[in-house]
């Protein structure tokens, strides 16, 4: 299975700025439109999806551990790590600044199209969240999904909080290490 070739609306920020709307009336960012095929072709990446920026588990455990363990992922053949959420580019950028990220790249899925294309878009209106990404991680090699780590989502709409076991950075890294002698992760 291949990842959906979704369009992402992203920002490139001017050198020396931390984002924001403008500097003396001049935007500190430039809108860029990227497709999944532009971002992930000819690379081995880990992409992890989570319910929302600035939420407790996402901010205290999931996102920071991927950033901390980046060098270990790199030693095991991963080129890049991307975090995606059904949030816009402004929110994702502000969250990356707040988290002081050094290694993980942010993938804003503001319309939820990437999550939907993967079957990971869930209805969280019962919690006031609207449509959100389910918590998952995947290893993608040249656009092909080698393995998905999907948290238990049966029934997804009933969870007051989201399960957090198999999409943890530590777990995904161990699975990659364990399969390093195999051609594929399946």
Give names to the regions the model predicted.
Residues 1-186:
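Chalcogenol-based redox active-site neighborhoods
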């Amino acid at each position: 299975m291949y990842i959906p070739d979704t369009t992402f609306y992203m920002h490139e920020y001017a050198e020396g700025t931390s984002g924001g709307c403008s500097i003396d009336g001049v935007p500190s960012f430039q809108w860029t439109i990227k497709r999944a095929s532009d971002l992930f072709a000819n690379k081995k990446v880990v992409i992890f999806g989570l319910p929302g920026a600035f939420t407790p588990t996402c901010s205290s455990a999931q996102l920071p551990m991927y950033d901390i363990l980046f060098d270990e992922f790199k030693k095991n053949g991963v080129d890049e790590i991307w975090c995606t959420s059904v949030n816009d580019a402004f929110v994702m950028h502000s969250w990356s600044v707040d988290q002081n990220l050094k290694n993980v790249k942010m993938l804003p899925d503001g319309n939820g199209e990437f999550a939907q294309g993967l079957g990971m878009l869930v209805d969280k209106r019962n919690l006031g969240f609207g449509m959100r990404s389910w918590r998952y991680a995947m290893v993608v090699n040249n656009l092909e999904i080698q393995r998905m780590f999907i948290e238990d989502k049966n029934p997804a709409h009933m969870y007051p909080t989201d399960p957090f076991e198999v999409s943890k950075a530590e777990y995904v890294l161990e699975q990659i290490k364990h399969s390093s002698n195999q051609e594929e992760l399946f």
